[in-house]
Amino acid sequence: MEPCRSLALFAGSLGLTSSLIALTTDFWIVATGPHFSAHSGLWPTSQETQVAGYIHVTQSFCILAVLWGLVSVSFLILSCIPALSAPGRGPLVSTVMAFSAALSILVAMAVYTSMRWSQTPFSQVQTFFSWSFYLGWVSFILFLFAGCLSLGAHCRTRRAEYETL
């Protein structure tokens, strides 16, 4: 297996794992006050609270990014097995899906970041982004790497020429 394909598979797997962890954990925001500390994520625990629209947008695009990342990694795995892959098409599909995952997670993170920054802070409470939030941005970078490396793997694959058919 060529190095671009194996590195793309590694970066895509890390991107998929980090986006799944970021999506499911509750440490996107941490709030500290004089006598308390609290954290929250994308999934509210109380049924009575009204969820803001930007949270729904972030949830939706994060889920899309996970799905695109899963398809990308699956096609990279299939491209490593010659009997299961179409000649030269696995890395190309993986490239498109990895870039789609990167775009989806970028939209999710940009919406969440812009809406959290525009909220007015309370005087006694300090809020800041936590590790789940930063893991979402890391998954964006990893999906970009996976897309670029998959594109490199696609460009380096040998295609059947007319004479060999």
UniProtKB/Swiss-Prot annotation:
Disruption phenotype: Cytotoxic activity of natural killer cells and CD8(+) T-cells are defective in knockout mice. Mice fail to resolve Leishmania donovani infection, which is accompanied by a sustained reduction in the production of pro-inflammatory cytokines and a defective CD4(+) T-cell response. Mice infected with Plasmodium berghei ANKA show a significant reduction in the recruitment of parasite-specific cytotoxic CD8(+) T cells to the brain, along with lower levels of inflammation. Induction: Up-regulated in CD4(+)T-cells in the liver and spleen upon infection with Leishmania donovani. The keyword NAD does not apply. Predominantly expressed by leukocytes with cytotoxic activity such as CD8(+) T-cells and natural killer cells. Its main location: membrane. One of its GO terms (cellular component) is cytolytic granule. Keywords: Cell membrane, Cytolysis, Inflammatory response, Lysosome, Membrane, Transmembrane, Transmembrane helix. InterPro entries: PMP-22/EMP/MP20-like (IPR050579), PMP22/EMP/MP20/Claudin (IPR004031), PMP22_EMP_MP20 (IPR004032). One of its GO terms (biological process) is natural killer cell mediated cytotoxicity. It is a multi-pass membrane protein. The chain crosses the membrane at residues 9-29, 61-81, 92-112, 133-153. Belongs to the PMP-22/EMP/MP20 family. Regulates cytotoxic granule exocytosis in effector lymphocytes, thus acting as a critical mediator of inflammation in a broad range of infectious and non-infectious diseases. Essential for cytotoxic degranulation of natural killer (NK) cells and CD8(+) T-cells and for the activation of CD4(+) T-cells following infection. Plays a critical role in CD8(+) T-cell and NK cell-mediated cytolysis of target cells and contributes to the cytolytic activity via the perforin/granzyme pathway by enhancing exocytosis of LAMP1-carrying lytic granules. This is Protein NKG7. The gene is Nkg7.
